[in-house]
């Protein structure tokens, strides 16, 4: 485990974190600007020093107040910043090999192949796109043979096309490398595609932490997501494709099924599906002959009126999964919706696109 128990005063912000994070998969650190996300990873990487406490990476003590403070180069931690920070006078190959702990042609070839850098090895940073530069920066960090990788909003400085270019490479790294990654981001799109675990920071303190789906669907996330962007994550398995239409059938743990747009590959693969709360409607009786392809039987767990009393957020239990729905107060009153009532949630298949579906690692 990555064990963190530290305090640090940063101007008006007091960062106080006491937690353990798994040494596997991708842990997303989420929060608003100024929450302490970058400050936390700087403390983990040794770029700044806690005022008190300790940090351990597995059995290795990285920091203990007044006793141990390993410098960054001794921590075996790779760091990828928002900007690539490449050496302009070095070629791509020179940047990649800078800081390699051991000359390993096999490791070099694997990282170059995973990041798609084969044709760029003789190029210089000035000739690369923003996404290509970040791939080189990621490769350089990995070639130092780290025990953990810190990534501080690596897509933040890129435009949308470059983000879409780089994201598949990050997905591949997350799946192929047995290396824990701490990934700082304020983008839920990135977190959906990459993360296994999630930690939410607010004013220097942890307000939620755990498996991605648990945190994403939790009440603690509601204040940090605009009402129109509230969504749920559902775990499902790719079952099959429709024989006549470009749709794919997913099966949830409770037996409910979802039809989503497009033809997904890899039958039987586990996936996470994002469903926007504004795309969910509710019936108290099973609808017949509807154009809506997805009708899920569930039970209302909680009701949360919005601040303006115009809408109500319903939390619906679907077996082991939970689903958020935004409806009007009028509809809630007319249907006499209360906690414990069985309902049918309707979701249009066309509202769930490829960007709303991510493989489970």
From Swiss-Prot:
A GO cellular component entry from the record: plasma membrane
Organism listed in the record: Shewanella oneidensis (strain ATCC 700550 / JCM 31522 / CIP 106686 / LMG 19005 / NCIMB 14063 / MR-1)
Domain of life, per lineage: Bacteria
GO molecular function: ABC-type molybdate transporter activity; ATP binding; ATP hydrolysis activity
All copies of domain ABC transporter, residue ranges: 1-228
Domain Mop intervals: 289-356
Residues the entry annotates as binding ATP: 31-38
Predominant subcellular localization, coarse grouping: membrane
Family assignment from sequence similarity: Belongs to the ABC transporter superfamily. Molybdate importer (TC 3.A.1.8) family.
Catalytic activity: molybdate(out) + ATP + H2O = molybdate(in) + ADP + phosphate + H(+)
Purpose of the protein: Part of the ABC transporter complex ModABC involved in molybdenum import. Responsible for energy coupling to the transport system.
Family matches, as PANTHER family: ABC TRANSPORTER I FAMILY MEMBER 10
Gene that encodes the chain: modC
The EC number(s) this enzyme carries: 7.3.2.5
Name of the protein this chain belongs to: Molybdenum import ATP-binding protein ModC
Taxonomic classification: Bacteria, Pseudomonadati, Pseudomonadota, Gammaproteobacteria, Alteromonadales
Mode of membrane association: Peripheral membrane protein
Quaternary structure annotation from Swiss-Prot or TrEMBL: The complex is composed of two ATP-binding proteins (ModC), two transmembrane proteins (ModB) and a solute-binding protein (ModA).
Pfam families on file: ABC_tran, TOBE
Cellular localization per UniProt: Cell inner membrane
Class of this enzyme: translocase
Keywords: ATP-binding, Cell inner membrane, Cell membrane, Membrane, Molybdenum, Nucleotide-binding, Translocase, Transport
The UniProt record lists the keyword Chaperone: no
InterPro entries, per database record: AAA+_ATPase, ABC_transporter-like_ATP-bd, ABC_transporter-like_CS, Mo/tungstate-bd_C_term_dom, ModC_ABC_ATP-bd, Molybdenum_import_ModC, Mop_domain, P-loop_NTPase
